[in-house]
Amino acid sequence: MNKEISTADILSGGESYSGISAVEKNAKAMMKVYNAIKTSFGPLGLDKMCVDSAGEVSITNDGATILQNMLIDDPAAKILVDLATQQDHEVGDGTTSVVLIAVSLIEKGAKLIASGVHPSVVVSGYKMAFNECVQFIKKSMSKSTLNLGSKALRNVVETSISSKVISSESEVFCGIVIDALKCIESVDENRKNMYPIEDINILKHPGGSMKESFLHQGYALNCSLASNFMKRQVKKPKILCIDFGLQKYKNPLTVSIVVDDPNKLEDIRKKELEITRRQIKTIIDSGANVVLTTRGIDDMCTKLLVEADVVGIRRCKKEDLLVIAKATGTSLVSSIADISGADSISSLGFADKFEVVQIGEEECVLINGLKKKMASIILRGANCQLLDEMQRSVHDAVCVLKRTLESNSVVPGGGAVECALSLMLEKFAFTVNSKEHVAIHRYAESLLSIPKILSTNAGLDSNELVANLLSSQSREMANSSGSKFLGIDVTSGKIQDNFEFGIIEPSVNKMKSLKAATEAAISILRINEVIILPPDQSKN
C-alpha cells in the first residue's frame, strides 16, 4: 500500500504551515506592520523617528518611508512594503491608507477562512466588491474639477499636505506646488494637458524658515563658483557641460619616461602645462562663457577662465548636467578630443539667463529661459531631517495635483468615500444569492477602518463618530436631494459636506488605492501553505 508523502517528510529541519495555520501566520505578521503605522495616518497622525544601522535619523509620517526603514523578516509582511513603495511610485500619496485597507481585508478574510469559508469564495467576493466600488465612485462620488473652479486645485493640495510637516505654511506651499505644475504644463498629440513631474527639481538648503521656500521657473542646482572673481550673472549664456576635470594634465601612471638629462624634466612639466592651456583655449575658443563640470577646476585653469571672462561651476552632479544639457539643446561632453585626436567642441547650450545666488551659507545656480519647460522648488528648513520630510511632503502634493489635473475628477475626503462605499456594499451584499455575500460584508467592514483610524488619531471617539456618520449618510442617501458627500472634520469632530468645505482628493488615487489593497489581500489569502527551508538548504 502506497504511503502518502507530506511536506514535513520532504523537508529536513525546515518548517511548514498549511491551511488555516498558514493564513493565520500571515495575518499575524501583517498586524504587526498595521499597528506600527496606523498612528501616523491622517491630519493629526503622529510622526515616527527611524534610525538606521549607520545612526542616520529620519523623522516622518510617510507610510512608504516608515515601512522601508523597518527591519521586516516575514516574507508576507514584505509584500506590504512593496505595496507601499509601488503606491508611492505610481500615485505618490495614500501609502499609509493602502496598507491599512489591505491589512484590514486580510484580517477579515483570514477570520472567514478560519470559520470554514473557502478561500476561493473570499477572493471572488472581494473582486465583486471592488468592481462595485469602482463603479460607485465613478457614477456617484466623483465631481469634475472644471465645475468646482480654480479653488478646487488649492483645496486638493491643502488636503494632501494637511497631514504633513509643511501644513503650518500651507498658503506658501499651495502656491508653490500649483505654480510649479503650471510651469511644466504641456500638450500631447491628442491635445490633452500633460504634467511631467520629473521636470520639477526639488533642492534643499538648510537654514531659514519653511516660509522662505520659493519656486524658480527654470533649473536650479546646488553648486558653487570656481572663483569669487567670476561673474555671478550672465545674460544669454552659452553653456558647455563637460564630464571631465579642468586640471593640470599629468601623464598616466602606466606611462614611463626615461630621461638622461635632469633638465629635460622641466621640459616635460612645460609640455604638461601646454596641454592644459590648449584644452582651456579650446573651451574658450568654442564661444562658451559658462562651463559646468562634474569634476574639479584647479587654480591654474581657474586663472585662465577668469582672464577669459568665463564662468566655471565645479562638482555638479552628472544627473543634473544631463538634464541641463538636454534642456539647453546640447549634450554632455565626455572629452574635447574628436575622432582624429584634435581638440574641438561641436555644440553649446543656450538659455536666457545664468545666475549664482547666495541662499543661506551656500550658493545656488539658477538657469532661466531653457528650451524645455522646467521648474525648481528650493526648500528652506531648520535642519536636514526637516528638509527630508519637507521634500517627501512636496513630492506627494505634486503627485496628487498632477493626478487631479490630468483626470479632472475629485472625491470628498475625511472618510466620506469609505463610509459611502461601506453602506453601498452592505445593500449590494443582500442582492447576492451566492456564498460571496459574506465576503462582501467583510469588505464593507474593512473600509470603515479608514474613518475609524482617522478619528482615533484625532483623539475622538471613533465608534460614536463613525456610527453617526453612517446614519447621517444613510439618511442623506434615502433622501434623493440630500448630500452623499458627508465626511469627518477631524479638527472639530463634526460631520459635514467635505466637498463644500474643500476636503477633497483625486478620485483616481482612491480607485488605485482600493485596487492595490484588494490585489495584495487576495494574493495573501490565496496562500495555502508556507514552506520555510533551513538556511543551509536555502544556500544550496
Curated annotation (Swiss-Prot):
NCBIfam families: chap_CCT_alpha, thermosome_beta. Molecular chaperone; assists the folding of proteins upon ATP hydrolysis. Component of the T-complex protein 1 (TCP1) complex. Belongs to the TCP-1 chaperonin family. GO terms for molecular function: ATP binding; ATP hydrolysis activity; ATP-dependent protein folding chaperone; unfolded protein binding. InterPro entries: Chap_CCT_alpha (IPR012715), Chaperone_TCP-1 (IPR017998), Chaperonin_TCP-1_CS (IPR002194), Cpn60/GroEL/TCP-1 (IPR002423), GroEL-like_apical_dom_sf (IPR027409), GROEL-like_equatorial_sf (IPR027413), TCP-1-like_intermed_sf (IPR027410), TCP-1_chaperonin (IPR053374). It comes from the Eukaryota. It comes from Encephalitozoon cuniculi (strain GB-M1). It is found in: Cytoplasm. GO terms for cellular component: chaperonin-containing T-complex. It holds the Pfam family Cpn60_TCP1. Its main location: cytoplasm. The keyword Chaperone applies. This is T-complex protein 1 subunit alpha. Keywords: ATP-binding, Chaperone, Cytoplasm, Nucleotide-binding.
